[in-house]
């Protein structure tokens, strides 16, 4: 229904004093000048100044009303629709208004002597106000709204909406009882200007729509004008007003007007004036309005003015601080400009453009002969362009950044490579155990470089499961070759601009990763490790895999073009090393340009060596444990590897070893194994404090033990520290440090039952064993069939169907009278059921499982097999020979069956991997049948 008038000018606009000053015209009054500046009133509209008065006494209202009525009687008919400051007759007298419209004021109460613009949204209320003016009774009651306990105070929009919905008794209950009789100064549209006259108190409701109430006119309690306390309080209010005048210019005109003419108003008016112009909240202002005791009202106003004074001081402090900061910066800027001008006149310093040009020329001068001609030409052109541009233009910054990149690249600057094969071998062996094929390839690269006298860039892809050392071996290769190392990961990369750079036309454009690499390392022949190349993304910004073709192709990277530089760069000397977990995810055109080296993972023996020679030393040093303080047995390491860390790599093994040494460190500290020397302090004072504390502790120990000599307790303390027992970690107490075993034996059966055969599988995490289980569901004539479970993929399901067919064929050949497959419904399962599985290499294992069930004969002990089978019984080659061999060794399998076509792959394995294994290579399933079920004949 009502909305408080708001303005960005100041809070004075909400409540503005309208007092007349005796002896001065309204136009010349300083207060009226302030009002005209704030509200926009001018000399042509001075009628409001004539009728804007304090009306706490009845005679004031009568005299002013009669004078104004006579002055503007001829213009009264059109005043409503024109100026908001039109003269309005004020008959009857204010004290005669005992029944008034109740207007809610939402934000601050209206004080006598002040005006307040409000917006009336209710048509009925607006019509009633206009009717009151026409009946020459332009008065209404302005009452502050109480807080709505059910509304969110932080939402002003919701609060105004709730006000508009209030009607009748509901609105009456939300109004404060004490308000102000307000004269309706003007109505223009839905804007109403109210001028406060005197205090009112609501007696009862007369009508609901619009809300009309009976009121009592309130008068101030009698008081002694000569009371010293009242005088002192009033003068303190005036003094505070003067202080506010010094700190805040917002109220300067108002305070000056009222303090200069102190005799023109009374103490009650002074209290109202101070409370009205303060920034007090609505409840504090309402408390002043309701107070009829003049002395108490002055005290309340004084408290509010003191708070206002404190706020003004804080504002002044903040303003001064900001002004000083800005002034200091401006002064510094002017002095710098003057200094530049003086240096330029003396020839000591050139301008910014000349300095930039000199800096860029100085950069390229040492390698000017090595810079390609086309690049040098572009640099010269851009330097000339830079001199013609204004320093404040955006093109100047673009050109400056472009020249900065062009001149900082290492054109023709190559690091001295190491062609010493023996030294390279030593470095590679220091950092990594095993990985002989990778080391051999790097040594071949060095040998070729030594024979040619120079080296060429190559693209090597290290493929293997996580944690086998693909990334770390790239760093070791760089150290062995004496090349700079740079790594960037392309996992999830979906923007071509990350590789090829952005065009310079874009805001914030930057070169690609390769150019950033050259700037970072400072040489043109670094070793660049492109990590996770099998996890490239593809999005709306292009295909990064296609962008890498130009980067990695030896035929193209000699003229690699970055979009930002727009000049070709020679990357033919760069050695690229890529890493991937699965090469199947790498696009074929990209894979074709790489030399793939597979890192299958580590066998148990290799993991033990790595843990003992590398991981344990690093963890011990990181935890501050001395070698003589702990001993980890080989059995503990073996148990840790087999029961906690079965993955192909050693990353998890490193975490577990670090966990063990952290617990050992905690145990040593609790048992008192502290270092002999004091802890290193961050500053000398702290070091002295530590020394004093240590000395006091030693002295305290001497007193307790009643030792006469000062040297004996120190020796005893040292003896106690050294005498702590060495922590022993073995298989029996390993669980106390790393918890319960995570893995259990993959070999589930000592003697595999009928229908169960162990196969070998390969995953991105390495090799593993895989059981194939088959059982009879139902028997009966003509009920033959096969159910398959185990979350198998399409390829593996087809392998099961092929295995069922081949098994029936073999059974028909060997035992024609056996009708097992024709009359038995079978169920083939591959545990574990929660693990997805796919691939053709389990074909021979499935056939063996079916035949074991048909012949009711288990396969031989310690046998595992792998191989794809055709319908004719031929065994096709498989992948992951090393991983599967490692998995078989881990499960203590001694006999393995591989396809004949994989014999060469097995022969290439290291001797420690092949040691102790009885491997059979077959090309037809008939041989597998003899190996699996003919063990009785072999034993005979």
Swiss-Prot record:
Its main location: mitochondrion. GO terms for cellular component: mitochondrial matrix; mitochondrion. The modification Phosphoserine is found at residue 74. GO terms for molecular function: ATP binding; ATP hydrolysis activity; ATP-dependent peptidase activity; sequence-specific DNA binding; serine-type endopeptidase activity; single-stranded DNA binding. Residues 751-935 form the Lon proteolytic domain. It is found in: Mitochondrion matrix. Residues 100-309 form the Lon N-terminal domain. InterPro entries: AAA+_ATPase, ATPase_AAA_core, Lon_bac/euk-typ, Lon_lid, Lon_proteolytic, Lon_Prtase, Lon_prtase_N, Lon_prtase_N_sf. Its EC number is 3.4.21.53. Homohexamer or homoheptamer. Organized in a ring with a central cavity. ATP-dependent serine protease that mediates the selective degradation of misfolded, unassembled or oxidatively damaged polypeptides as well as certain short-lived regulatory proteins in the mitochondrial matrix. May also have a chaperone function in the assembly of inner membrane protein complexes. Participates in the regulation of mitochondrial gene expression and in the maintenance of the integrity of the mitochondrial genome. Binds to mitochondrial DNA in a site-specific manner. Belongs to the peptidase S16 family. This is Lon protease homolog 1, mitochondrial. It comes from Arabidopsis thaliana. The lineage of its organism: Eukaryota, Viridiplantae, Streptophyta, Embryophyta, Tracheophyta.
């Amino acid at each position: 229904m009502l909305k408080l008038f708001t303005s960005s000018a100041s809070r004075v606009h909400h409540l503005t004093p309208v007092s007349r000053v005796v002896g001065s015209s309204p136009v010349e009054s300083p207060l009226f000048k302030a009002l005209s500046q704030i509200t926009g009133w001018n000399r042509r509209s001075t009628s409001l100044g004539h009728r804007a008065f304090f009306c706490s006494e009845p005679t004031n209202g009568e005299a002013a009303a009669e004078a104004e009525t006579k002055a503007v009687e001829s213009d009264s008919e059109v005043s409503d629709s024109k100026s908001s400051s039109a003269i309005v007759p004020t008959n009857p007298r204010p004290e005669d208004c005992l029944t008034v419209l109740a207007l809610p004021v939402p934000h601050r109460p209206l004080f006598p002597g002040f005006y307040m613009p409000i917006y009336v949204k209710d048509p009925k209320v607006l019509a009633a106000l206009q009717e009151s003016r026409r009946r020459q009774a332009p008065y209404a009651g302005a009452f502050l709204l109480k807080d709505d306990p059910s509304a969110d105070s932080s939402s002003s929009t919701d609060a105004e909406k709730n006000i508009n919905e209030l009607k009748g008794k509901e609105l009456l209950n939300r109004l404060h009882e004490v308000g102000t009789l307000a004269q309706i100064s003007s109505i223009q549209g839905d804007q109403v200007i109210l001028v406060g006259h005197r205090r009112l108190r609501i007696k009862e409701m007369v009508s609901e729509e619009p809300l009309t109430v009976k009121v009592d006119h309130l008068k101030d309690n009698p008081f002694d004008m000569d009371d010293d306390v009242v005088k002192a309080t009033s003068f303190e209010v005036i003094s505070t007003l003067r202080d506010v005048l010094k700190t805040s210019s917002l109220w300067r005109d108002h305070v000056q007007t009222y303090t200069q003419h102190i005799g023109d108003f009374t103490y009650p008016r002074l209290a109202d004036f101070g409370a009205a112009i303060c920034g007090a909240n609505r409840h504090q202002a309402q408390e002043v309005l309701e107070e009829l005791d003049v002395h108490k009202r002055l005290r309340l106003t004084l408290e509010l003015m003191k708070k206002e004074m404190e706020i003004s001081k804080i504002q002044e402090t903040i303003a001064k601080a900001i002004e000083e900061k800005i002034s200091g910066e401006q002064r510094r800027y002017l002095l710098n400009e003057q200094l530049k001008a003086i240096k330029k006149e003396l020839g000591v310093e050139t301008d910014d453009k000349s300095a930039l040009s000199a800096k860029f020329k100085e950069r390229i001068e040492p390698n000017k002969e090595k810079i390609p001609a086309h690049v040098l030409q572009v640099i010269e052109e851009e330097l000339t362009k830079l001199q013609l541009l204004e320093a404040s233009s955006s093109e100047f910054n673009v050109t400056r950044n472009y020249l900065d990149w062009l001149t900082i690249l290492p054109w023709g600057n190559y690091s001295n490579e190491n062609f010493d094969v023996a030294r390279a071998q030593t470095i590679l062996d220091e950092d990594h155990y095993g990985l002989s094929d990778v080391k051999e390839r790097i040594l071949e690269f060095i040998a070729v470089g030594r024979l040619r006298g120079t080296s060429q860039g190559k693209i090597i892809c290290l493929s293997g499961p996580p944690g086998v050392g693909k990334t770390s071996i790239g760093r070791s290769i760089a150290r062995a070759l004496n090349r700079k190392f740079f790594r960037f990961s392309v996992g999830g990369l979906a923007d071509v601009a990350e590789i090829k750079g952005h065009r310079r036309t874009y805001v914030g454009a930057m070169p690609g990763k390769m150019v950033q690499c050259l700037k970072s390392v400072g040489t043109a022949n670094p070793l660049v490790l492109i990590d996770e190349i099998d996890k490239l993304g593809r999005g709306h910004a292009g295909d990064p895999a296609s962008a890498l073709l130009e980067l990695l192709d030896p035929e193209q990277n000699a003229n690699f073009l970055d979009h930002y530089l727009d000049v070709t760069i020679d990357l033919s000397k760069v050695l690229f090393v890529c890493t991937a977990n699965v090469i199947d995810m790498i696009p074929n055109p990209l894979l074709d340009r790489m030399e793939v080296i597979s890192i299958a993972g580590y066998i148990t023996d290799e993991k033990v060596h790595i843990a003992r020679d590398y991981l344990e030393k690093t963890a011990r040093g990181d935890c501050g444990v001395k070698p003589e303080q702990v001993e980890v047995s080989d059995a503990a390491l073996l148990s840790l590897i087999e029961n906690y860390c079965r993955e192909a790599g050693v990353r998890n093994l490193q975490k577990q070893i670090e966990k063990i040494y952290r617990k050992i460190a905690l145990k040593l500290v609790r048992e008192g194994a502290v270092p002999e020397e004091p802890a290193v302090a961050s500053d000398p004072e702290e070091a002295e404090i530590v020394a004093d504390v240590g000395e006091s502790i030693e002295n305290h120990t001497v007193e307790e033990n009643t030792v006469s000599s000062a040297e004996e307790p120190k020796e005893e303390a040292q003896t106690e520290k050294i005498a702590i027992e060495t922590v022993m970690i073995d298989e029996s107490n390993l669980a106390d440090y790393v918890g319960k075993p995570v893995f259990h034996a993959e070999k589930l059966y000592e003697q595999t039952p009928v229908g169960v055969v162990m196969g070998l599988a390969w995953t991105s995490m390495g090799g593993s064993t895989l059981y194939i289980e088959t059982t009879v569901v139902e028997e009966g004539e003509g009920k033959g069939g096969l159910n398959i479970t185990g979350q198998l993929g399409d390829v593996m399901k087809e392998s099961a169907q092929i295995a069922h067919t081949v098994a029936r064929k073999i059974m028909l050949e060997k035992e024609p009278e056996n009708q097992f497959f024709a009359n038995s419904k079978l169920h083939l399962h591959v545990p574990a059921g929660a693990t997805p599985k796919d691939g053709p290499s389990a074909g021979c294992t499935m056939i063996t499982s079916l035949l074991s069930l048909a012949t009711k004969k288990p396969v031989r002990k310690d046998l595992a097999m792998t191989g794809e089978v055709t319908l004719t019984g031929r065994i096709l080659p498989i992948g992951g020979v090393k991983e599967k061999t490692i998995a078989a060794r881990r499960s203590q399998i001694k006999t393995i069956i591989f396809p004949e076509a994989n014999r060469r792959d097995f022969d290439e394995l290291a001797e420690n991997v092949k040691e102790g294994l009885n491997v059979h290579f077959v090309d037809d399933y008939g041989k597998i049948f003899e190996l699996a079920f003919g063990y009785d004949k072999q034993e005979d």
